Amino acid sequence: MTTLDQFATDKLARLEAGALRRRLRPTARAPGAVLERDGQRLISFSCNDYLNLSTHPAVIDAAIDAARRHGAGAGASRLVTGDHPLYCALEARLAALKQTEDAVVFGSGFLANTGIIPALMAREDAIFVDELAHACIWAGARLSGAALHVFRHNDLAHLAELLAAHRQAARHAMVVTDGVFSMDGDLAPVGEMLALAKAHDAWLMTDDAHGIGVINEGRGSAHGHDVPLQMGTLSKAVGSYGGYLCASHVVCELIRNRARSFVYTTGLPPAVVGASIAALDLIATDPAMCAAPLAHARRFCAALGLPPAESPIVPLLLGTAERALAAQAVLEAAGFLVAAIRPPTVPEGTARLRFAFTACHAPDDIDRLAQLVHDRILVTA
């Protein structure tokens, strides 16, 4: 009989053999782009804190004040006694930024998607998902029990073909996509996708985890389109923690009643909620700050002759996990931290370096990084 420890050891050995084992590495962050790891100071291009708001004095002060006034924890599910007034203020800020009637806050983006999708979809329904959608979208879709149809990445013709073939057999239909794709940095064609969904009587849901705060003056990838379900996170450009859904009031009320990851979860800590409110206020009033990460990504792309970035995320595909790890080591030795992304996070054969640009990156550091990538990685590829 295999013991649990033996089972785990064998699994880890297989991951190690494929250069796919991951390890936690304690990392000390400070204001700005510099961090310390294993005694080395590194300029990080691997952080999703795109606006550096997690260390903004106003955001920190708001977190401290909320904790002092409301305590360290919510104390209960929001449907019991955990619905402090701060939550209503946060949801109002989100709805205002996204220009929707209402919003619902979740404990994380993963909890949001695994709660929203099963609350709206069931076995009699059909879900159409972009093949590169985030893992939590897949988790939510599978939990729902609905028929799952996968369309090629950003391929509207393939989506139309699948809708034509499968929509009529389903009670309800939902099209789900990332607004900004977290590993490729490209944007979904939201306007065209919305028109296609409406033509087939389907609901469109966008995951804007990497769009809020940095696309369309901070309003996100769905801005300007009447997308009925706009989901996202508070843990990236907002610099805090949590997930959300922006939608109509009646849809949000249904989610508050039916999303299991909302109903059966203690509310976010007041400090997190206070920090998120302060960050959203900064995003709403500083479009120049919101534009900086994309401008920095485009500066990097121009220096390397790459196509202009669509978001603060720039991938450099290297193929194998071994090559990606070797490239990461080259940059780390020179004082830059750029994460190697390997399967299963990305498809087999597409391991890459993922460059994430923030508002505080200095132009000189971006230029030095681009030169290093050119000389030590691209030239030797």
From Swiss-Prot:
EC number: 2.3.1.47
Record flagged with keyword Transferase: yes
Gene3D superfamilies listed in its UniProt record: Aspartate Aminotransferase, domain 1 (3.90.1150.10), Type I PLP-dependent aspartate aminotransferase-like (Major domain) (3.40.640.10)
Residue positions, PTM N6-(pyridoxal phosphate)lysine: K236
Cofactor dependence: pyridoxal 5'-phosphate
Catalytic function, reaction form: 6-carboxyhexanoyl-[ACP] + L-alanine + H(+) = (8S)-8-amino-7-oxononanoate + holo-[ACP] + CO2
UniProt GO MF annotations: 8-amino-7-oxononanoate synthase activity; pyridoxal phosphate binding
Job description of the protein: Catalyzes the decarboxylative condensation of pimeloyl-[acyl-carrier protein] and L-alanine to produce 8-amino-7-oxononanoate (AON), [acyl-carrier protein], and carbon dioxide.
Family: Belongs to the class-II pyridoxal-phosphate-dependent aminotransferase family. BioF subfamily.
Subunit comment: Homodimer.
The protein, known as: Putative 8-amino-7-oxononanoate synthase
